[in-house]
């Protein structure tokens, strides 16, 4: 099987937790965190994969923010018969960017839908219904046990399947996937929170593994 991920916390989660059986089966767009790559990239990967491994699955992990940016290739995959398994993790907006805001000592601003001051009545997207409208099989799960059962159903299906799961926007990370991000902070500020965040940033930078 092949796994595809791109933006938010998912590259770190896949890197930390996915156990691959051979090289060339993990496609993580890590460098630029390219939101929207996940589904389109998976469709392209599936086209290539189906030539030599038609029985294998292509699995895409995508957050709700990236899904809303680019999802139309769900329809493409159904139309062309190139099956995907897509896991949509819904944290109510751009929770990783919100996390980075908070980690630098700042307040939440315009990243979680509920925090947008110009929205009078925030509402959730029905991702399950949206995926079904493009011809995919789709279901919503409430916990990891339901996720496992839904994933098995997706594996046995003969067409694109979308599994939707809500995750906590503040603590929805595994221990291994709780990656440190180098996000700069002001050097001069009156905010104690930002000064403390800057001290932590300076102490964490030397711990990074050098690129090869």
Name what the model sees in each region.
Residues 13-212:
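Thiamine diphosphate
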Residues 1-9:
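Active-site pocket-lining segments that scaffold enzyme catalytic pockets across diverse folds
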């Amino acid at each position: 099987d092949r796994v595809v991920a791109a933006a938010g916390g998912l590259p770190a989660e896949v890197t930390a937790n996915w156990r691959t059986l051979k090289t060339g089966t993990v496609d993580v767009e890590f460098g630029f965190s390219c939101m929207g790559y996940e589904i389109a990239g998976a469709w392209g990967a599936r086209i290539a994969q189906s030539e030599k491994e038609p029985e294998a699955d292509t699995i895409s992990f995508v957050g709700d923010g990236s899904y809303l940016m680019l999802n139309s290739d769900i329809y493409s995959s159904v139309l062309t018969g190139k099956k995907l398994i897509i896991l949509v993790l819904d944290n109510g907006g751009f929770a990783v960017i919100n996390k980075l805001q908070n980690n630098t000592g700042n307040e939440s601003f315009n990243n979680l839908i509920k925090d947008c001051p110009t929205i009078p009545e925030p509402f959730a997207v029905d991702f399950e219904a949206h995926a079904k409208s493009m011809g995919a099989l789709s279901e919503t799960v409430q916990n990891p046990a339901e996720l496992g059962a839904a994933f098995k159903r997706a594996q046995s299906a003969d067409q694109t399947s979308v599994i939707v799961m809500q995750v906590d926007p503040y603590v929805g990370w595994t221990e291994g996937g709780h990656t440190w991000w180098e996000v700069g902070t002001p050097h001069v500020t009156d905010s104690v929170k930002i000064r403390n965040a800057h001290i932590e940033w300076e102490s964490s930078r030397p711990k990074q593994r050098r690129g090869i």
